[in-house]
């Protein structure tokens, strides 16, 4: 159980990190943190996982370019706006890659779960950041569940969001983002997120049956 709790905390942190990354422009202070010991250690720990290693290497290379980029915060903000906010943007919304019903399904899910994201995310609720943030919250609910049955329920909710939403459309977003990002920071981040989502789906398929025993 302790291993489950530790893994849950790490998974939630990853989802929230990616949610922040794709939801708003990074400030210069946030960019500077990518040169900190904590972030370097964090990425190094991810690179110990074989499926993640090439994606982490690509992101580290993009970070190295970003840290020495002229007016880096302004330049990265321009990348963000051009990629995700312009008329020809790579839309970070599920409904833009599947169909309009995706937005309604996510709205219904949040209502059923009694989760309100409006204060944190002004975007429509099928935005990538919202779906990633939701996964982080569901992970913590599973970790804090007082019984095996409730833990099983929250693990099932995680699988539903992953397979019913994120994995259904994110691969399309990832391809488009990588093709449209010449500097490469967001493209590399999307690649790493894609690997993580696949690995997390595999993790859930393994941990869900085993979690039924306290």
Swiss-Prot record:
Record-linked SUPFAM superfamilies: TorD-like
Example GO biological process: protein complex oligomerization
Alphabetic keyword roster: Chaperone, Cytoplasm
Alphabetized Pfam families for the sequence: Nitrate_red_del
Gene3D superfamilies to which the protein is assigned, alphabetical: 1.20.120.1820, HscB, C-terminal domain (1.20.1280.20)
Cell compartments where the protein resides: Cytoplasm
Protein family: Belongs to the TorD/DmsD family. TorD subfamily.
Protein name, per record: Chaperone protein TorD
Species this chain originates from: Aeromonas salmonicida (strain A449)
This protein's encoding gene: torD
């Amino acid at each position: 159980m302790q291993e489950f709790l530790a893994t849950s905390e790490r998974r939630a942190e990853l989802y929230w990190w990616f949610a922040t990354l794709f939801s708003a422009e990074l400030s210069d202070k946030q960019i500077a943190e990518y040169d900190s010991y904590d972030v370097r250690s964090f990425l190094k720990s991810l690179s110990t996982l074989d499926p993640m290693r090439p994606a982490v290497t690509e992101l580290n290379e993009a970070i190295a370019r970003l840290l020495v980029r002229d007016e880096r915060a302004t330049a990265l903000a321009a990348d963000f706006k051009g990629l995700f906010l312009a008329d020809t943007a790579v839309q970070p919304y599920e409904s833009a890659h599947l169909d309009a019903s995706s937005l309604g399904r996510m709205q219904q899910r949040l209502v059923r779960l009694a989760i309100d994201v409006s204060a944190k995310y002004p975007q429509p609720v099928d935005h990538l950041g919202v779906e990633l943030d939701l996964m982080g919250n569901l992970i913590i609910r599973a970790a804090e569940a007082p019984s095996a049955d409730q833990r099983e329920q929250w693990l099932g909710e995680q699988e539903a969001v992953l397979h019913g939403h994120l994995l259904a459309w994110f691969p399309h977003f990832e391809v488009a983002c990588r093709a449209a990002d010449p500097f490469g920071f967001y493209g590399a981040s999307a690649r790493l997120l894609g690997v993580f989502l696949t690995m997390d789906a595999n993790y859930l398929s393994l941990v869900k049956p085993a979690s039924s025993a306290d």
